[in-house]
Design a protein with these regions (language model features):
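DNA-contacting surface of Y-family translesion DNA polymerases
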Residues: 8, 181, 189-334, 339-372
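Gly/Gly-Pro- and Ser/Thr-rich, intrinsically disordered tail segments characteristic of DNA damage-repair
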Residues: 1-215, 220-221, 345-347, 354-373
Length: 373
C-alpha cells in the first residue's frame, strides 16, 4: 500500500500578518486583531505580541495588561476571506483533495498530485513560495503520512517553517510529544491526563485502550491510536455542516428582563440572516448563555419541522430563556443561538452548493470536552 502524503498548511498569525502587510507602520510592533472595547476579545495576535503572552480568545483588557503598547486593529473578516480564497486557488494547482479546516489552514493530500512531483516536501516548498509571491504572507507547512502528524509538524517550526515527520521516525517523535500538543487535548482532558501520570506520548502509549475508553469515552480510542501514530482519516473535500449559529457579547452585563428579551430578539434576527445565507435547515435550537463570571450553560429544544422562520424560532428561544436563572448578582455577558440537527441529505446538499462558490471553512471539532461528562 502506498504511504499517503499529507500536507498541513497553516498561515502565520494570519489576520495580524495581513494588517502588518497593509500598514507598514504596524510592522515589527505588537498587534492584535479584535474589537477594542471593554468586552473585546483578541482574534489573532502578531508574533511580536505573543512574546508578551498575548493570544487568541484572550480579553483585550488582559492582553493590554500583558502588553501595554499593544496596538488593536479592527477585524476585517470579509477581506481576510478573499485572501484565503486566493490561497485556496494556489492549493488547487497541486491537488483537488483539499480540506479547509479554518480560514487560515487546510490539509492537502498530495499522494497523487497534478504536477507529478514525487516529494511532498518539494510541493510544500513550492506552495509556501507561491503564497509569499501572491500575497506577501508567510505560511508554515507540516508533512507526514497522516493528518494528526502533519498538523503537529506545521506547528513545530513556526513561523515560516517546514517540517516533515517520516513514518520511520513517527513513534520516536510521538513518544517525546507533550500531551497538550496532541490534537483534541483541551484543558479538562489535560488535567485528567496529568492526574493519571500521562505527560507525553510515551506515557500515553503505556495506558490500555480499555482504560482510556473508561476515562475519556470515545476520545480514548483516538488517543490510543494517535499515541501509536495511527490516523486513517481521509482528507475530506467538503465537511458536512452540522449547525448554523451566532452569538454576541454585550458591552455591559445585562439582567433586566426587558433588556435580555431585546438582545435575544436581535440574536434571533442575526440567526435568521445566517440561516438564509447558508441554506442550512435544522430541527434543534440551542441557546447559549455566558454569565459575568464566565460560567455558561446551554439549553436545547427539538421539533419535527425545520426551523427557518422568525415565528418558529423566537417562541422557542423565549421558552429556552425561561429555563435560565439570571439576576443582578448573576448577570448575562453573552447570548448565542444555533440551529442544528439537519438530515444528512439536507446538510450534504448545502455543502455541495457552497463548495461550488468557495471553500466552506469550519473549525475542526477535535476538542473532546463534550465527551467527558
Amino acid at each position: 500500500m502506498t504511504e499517503r502524503k499529507i500536507i498541513h498548511i497553516d498561515m502565520d498569525a494570519f489576520f495580524a500578518a495581513v494588517e502588518q502587510r497593509d500598514n507598514p507602520e504596524l510592522r515589527g510592533k505588537p498587534v492584535a486583531v479584535g474589537f477594542d472595547g471593554p468586552r473585546g476579545v483578541v482574534s489573532t495576535a502578531s508574533y511580536e505580541a505573543r512574546k508578551y503572552g498575548v493570544h487568541s480568545a484572550q480579553s483585550i483588557a488582559q492582553a493590554k495588561q500583558r502588553c501595554p503598547n499593544l496596538i488593536i486593529v479592527p477585524c476585517r473578516h470579509d477581506y481576510y476571506a478573499k485572501i484565503s480564497h486566493q490561497i485556496h486557488q494556489i492549493f488547487q494547482e497541486y491537488t483537488d483533495l483539499i480540506e479547509p479546516i479554518s480560514i487560515d489552514e487546510a490539509f492537502l493530500d498530495v499522494t497523487q498530485n497534478k504536477k507529478g512531483i514525487e516529494l511532498a516536501v518539494d510541493i510544500a516548498k513550492e506552495i509556501k513560495t507561491r503564497i509569499k509571491e501572491a500575497t506577501g504572507l508567510t505560511a508554515s507547512a507540516g508533512i507526514s503520512y497522516c493528518k494528526f502528524l502533519a498538523k503537529v509538524a506545521s506547528d513545530y517550526r513556526k513561523p515560516d517553517g517546514i517540517c516533515t515527520i517520516h513514518p520511520d521516525k513517527a513513534l520516536d517523535f510521538i513518544a517525546q510529544l507533550p500531551v497538550e500538543d496532541f490534537w483534541g487535548v483541551g484543558k479538562k482532558t489535560l488535567q485528567k491526563m496529568h492526574f493519571m501520570g500521562i505527560f507525553n506520548g510515551a506515557d500515553l502509549r503505556k495506558v490500555s485502550e480499555e482504560h482510556l475508553l473508561e476515562v475519556f469515552g470515545k476520545a480514548g480510542h483516538i488517543f490510543y491510536d494517535f499515541a501509536r501514530g495511527i490516523d486513517e482519516r481521509p482528507v475530506i473535500t467538503y465537511r458536512e455542516r452540522k449547525s448554523v449559529g451566532c452569538e454576541q457579547t454585550f458591552l455591559e452585563d445585562i439582567y433586566l428582563k426587558t433588556a435580555v428579551i431585546i438582545e435575544l430578539y436581535r440574536t434571533v434576527l442575526e440567526l435568521l440572516e445566517r440561516i438564509a445565507k447558508s441554506g442550512f435547515e435544522g430541527r434543534t435550537l440551542t441557546l447559549k448563555v455566558k454569565f459575568a463570571d464566565f460560567t455558561q450553560i446551554t439549553r436545547s429544544i427539538s421539533q419535527e419541522k425545520v426551523l427557518k422562520k422568525k415565528d418558529e424560532i423566537l417562541p422557542l428561544a423565549k421558552r429556552l430563556l425561561q429555563q435560565v436563572d439570571y439576576s443582578s448578582i448573576h448577570p448575562i455577558r453573552l447570548i448565542g443561538l444555533s440551529v442544528s440537527n439537519a438530515t444528512s441529505e439536507e446538510a450534504r446538499m448545502v455543502d455541495k452548493e457552497n463548495s461550488i462558490q468557495k471553500p466552506e471553512y469550519k473549525e475542526l471539532e477535535l476538542e473532546f470536552e463534550d465527551w467527558e461528562t
